[in-house]
């Protein structure tokens, strides 16, 4: 399919958000403390680099998601606001120590690390990521670690190296339905992502595996349901579903604003497949990740668990 045949619309829907997408910004002392702690260490976060709409919410409760292996990506996905580069800097050998110092200062018990895609590195950056994780285990031995990883270009050895580092959650997002993947994700495929998730689930059956999708890109209800089934069939345990919001006019336009009732419906569909679903307009992969982790851990030892407020 050529660019002219892309199913993604050229124009965005009206810029005015529906009422369920309007939120108060909880700025205050805690937000300022988090901001200072992160900036004093010179650490990039996906909260800032990807222009996440939840930054003020998360930072106001002393949580943040660290962006590892630099602040520029070797892929240029149409939905993402992280800078693109063909020649990224080498991994910082002190990055793990910097993240550990920041996490200590914030009092984090559950540390979430995501990464830029590093197709310039032989193992996609897995070794550098493992070094960070090992440092965190040493400096914060009681903290749990969640990693949102790239697809490592399908490198299974790199994946296993990461999984051997004793993480609590392995997260890899399919991002959208299969039909839209070529137009949303640069140099990635839907089936390769499913393969990585399935391999992780088989390699460590007790590991919490997680993935996420955005809605509002022009997907059909039937496609979302199929995606949830695909994720369940490939060993995923946790799925996040959130509204795609266009970071700038350079990015893929929003096709629709999905109602809270539709998110509730998708949650019920996923739960019927045995998935642990966290869905809502502002939900992102790492949004309330600590609470989702605790709820999932409770579910594994009981018949029910409460999710944090989805809005």
Curated annotation (Swiss-Prot):
It is found in: Cytoplasm. Its main location: cytoplasm. It catalyses: [[Fe-S] cluster scaffold protein carrying a second [4Fe-4S](2+) cluster] + N(6)-octanoyl-L-lysyl-[protein] + 2 oxidized [2Fe-2S]-[ferredoxin] + 2 S-adenosyl-L-methionine + 4 H(+) = [[Fe-S] cluster scaffold protein] + N(6)-[(R)-dihydrolipoyl]-L-lysyl-[protein] + 4 Fe(3+) + 2 hydrogen sulfide + 2 5'-deoxyadenosine + 2 L-methionine + 2 reduced [2Fe-2S]-[ferredoxin]. Its cofactor is [4Fe-4S] cluster. [4Fe-4S] cluster 2 binds at residues 73, 77, 80. Residues 59-276 form the Radical SAM core domain. Its EC number is 2.8.1.8. Pathway: Protein modification; protein lipoylation via endogenous pathway; protein N(6)-(lipoyl)lysine from octanoyl-[acyl-carrier-protein]: step 2/2. [4Fe-4S] cluster 1 binds at residues 47, 52, 58, 286. GO terms for cellular component: cytoplasm. Keywords: 4Fe-4S, Cytoplasm, Iron, Iron-sulfur, Metal-binding, S-adenosyl-L-methionine, Transferase. One of its GO terms (molecular function) is 4 iron, 4 sulfur cluster binding. Disulfide bonds: none annotated. Binds 2 [4Fe-4S] clusters per subunit. One cluster is coordinated with 3 cysteines and an exchangeable S-adenosyl-L-methionine. The keyword Aminoacyl-tRNA synthetase does not apply. Belongs to the radical SAM superfamily. Lipoyl synthase family. This is Lipoyl synthase.
